[in-house]
Curated annotation (Swiss-Prot):
A Gene Ontology cellular-component term: mitochondrion
Protein name in UniProt: LOB domain-containing protein 1
InterPro entries in the record: LOB
Residue ranges occupied by any LOB domain in the UniProt entry: 32-133
Renumbered residue ranges of the record's region Disordered: 1-27
Biased composition (Polar residues): 1-11
Similarity field: Belongs to the LOB domain-containing protein family.
Tissue: Expressed in young shoots, roots, stems, leaves and flowers.
Organism: Arabidopsis thaliana
Length: 190
């Protein structure tokens, strides 16, 4: 048989001397709903499909996409995609929606056309610059060849001109290596 003292000992909690507080319940974190749920005025579920892509700090992002595509179409589209592609899809939808709002007729296609036209104009400018560069290189090579030819011609003229004046004002032949035969030496000695 059990005594009353044994039963009371078993139900009383043992308090340790380390004085640690009993585990308390963590305070419930209240997160603000995503921008999509705020705009749609609905409760944001824990597994909201739109929450990772439309943060509460950027409501304009969802507003723009919602105006053009509608919330149900955005949700359906995201549910059909794998999670790895959803971020790019949302960014693309927002870009397309912004383009459609700016240009209701052409939308994104108008921006693409404008960019393609810029690319073709820049390619034409690049081709023109490359042609000018080739012409300048050709002119440079012609100029260098002309300078080289002129330099060679001057050297030949200096080599051809074999007479220079000496200190006495007479001309002597520098090309002749035999220094004993000068032109003023008499041919006949008496």
């Amino acid at each position: 048989m059990e005594s009353k003292s044994d039963a009371s000992v078993a139900t009383t909690p043992i308090i340790s001397s380390s004085s640690s507080p009993p585990p308390s319940l963590s305070p419930r974190v209240v997160l603000s709903p995503c921008a999509a749920c705020k705009i749609l005025r609905r409760r944001c579920a824990e597994r909201c499909v739109l929450a990772p892509y439309f943060p509460p700090t950027d409501p304009a992002k969802f507003t723009i996409a919602h105006r053009v595509f509608g919330a149900s179409n955005i949700i359906k589209f995201l549910q059909e995609l794998p999670e790895s592609q959803r971020t790019d899809a949302v960014n693309s939808m927002v870009y397309e929606a912004e383009a459609r709002i700016r240009d209701p007729v052409y939308g994104c296609a108008g921006a693409i056309y404008h960019l393609q036209r810029q690319v073709s104009e820049l390619q034409a400018q690049l081709a023109k610059a490359q042609v000018e560069m080739v012409n300048m290189q050709f002119q440079r090579s012609n100029l260098l060849e002309l300078i080289y030819n002129m330099d060679q011609q001057q050297k030949q003229e200096q080599d051809n001109m074999s007479f220079e004046s000496n200190d006495l004002g007479f001309l002597e032949d520098k090309s002749n290596t035999n220094s004993s035969m000068l032109w003023w030496d008499p041919l006949w000695t008496c």
